[in-house]
Structure formats: C-alpha cells, structure tokens
Amino acid sequence: STRVRSSAASDVYKRQKYVVPVAEHHDGFQMYRSNISHWNAYEMGPKRDIVGELKAAVEAQGMTLGVSSHRIEHWFFMSNGKKFESDMPQNPDRDDLYWPSMPDPENFDAIDGKPSEEFMEDWLVRTCELIDNYHPKILYFDWWIQQEAAKPYLKKAAAYYYNRAAEWNEEVAIDYKFDAYMFGTAVPDIERGQMADIKPYFW
C-alpha cells in the first residue's frame, strides 16, 4: 500500500487528474475484492484490494477514480487454452475462472458469436458490484461491448450507474466504443484515433 500511496502522490499522477485502472481484464481475474468470484487479487494474491487501495490513494490527492471493465471478452478469451495441453478443461463448468471459454467469434462483429443471457447477467452483476463498492466517476468499457446481445444489459448498467450517481449527488460518465450506446447517453471513445475537426461534445 505504501507503493500505491507514493505513486498516487507523485506529480505525474497529479497532473493527469484522472486514474482509471483495469478492474477486470479479459482473463477474468478481478483486481478488487469481490463477492462474485474467488479469482480476485484479494483472495488469490497479492491478498490486496488493488482498486480499493488505489481509490483511497488517488482521492486523498484530490484526483478522480474511474474503473475499466474488459469482462465481455472473457466470453471467448480462455478458449485457446483448449487447443494445446494445459489445465484448461474442454467443457468447463460454470466456475470462477474458465467459464464459459467459447470459441473465438469468426468476425468479431456485432452479431457473430453472441454471448448468452446467462453470461450477460453475470457481466451485469459484476458491473453493478464495481459501481456499488467503489463509486467510480468514470466507467470505461472496452472493445466488443457493441455486441448486439449486450445492448439490453448496457442499458440496464447505465440506468443503474446513473441512478446511483444521482443518489451520491455526483456527476459520472460512461466511456464506450463504436455504437454500444446511443449517442448522447454516454461518452464515445476513439482509441488510437482522432476526430477530423473540433466537436462540440465530449469524447
């Protein structure tokens, strides 16, 4: 925790104003204490709530904490482990780490390889847990979130987040890619790109 505090106190961090750590990447390992999965930094190692410690450190310096979720790509991320000899089961039960391990989508477009309702319900619960436990001011979603099967759950997540923010009397933002959200309901993100000219809206 000393290292986290000293990093957050550095001039480099202070000049950034926003700190948005990865809360969960495609591998399904949560960098925070969770009641949903045992595969998290608090239980498995380093036995610390990384997001929680970082929140305390950056907010003590007057900075803003956000979190990013890459969970949706876990739908297929582990599947390549089935292609060679590994500890990856061929037909994983619904466990905390390997499930669901579906094959890579063929085109990674908005309709190919769509995640199941069961998986999206799990995604939504994880997102709400992050919102409730850490009150992030920014909620960033990575690529493939534009998947058509995700759209109803994105609406539910946004409604939950914005309603919670109203209860906290805080302004918050959702960052998204492609057409995951209807324009004007969240903040579009252009990764490794730029607009052709100045725009009158946040991006």
Predicted regions and their residues:
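Acidic/aromatic-lined carbohydrate-recognition and catalytic surfaces
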Residues: 17, 21-84
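Aromatic-lined carbohydrate-recognition surfaces of secreted/lumenal glycan-active proteins
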Residues: 61-76, 140-144, 168-182
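Conserved, mostly hydrophobic/aromatic
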Residues: 11, 58, 139
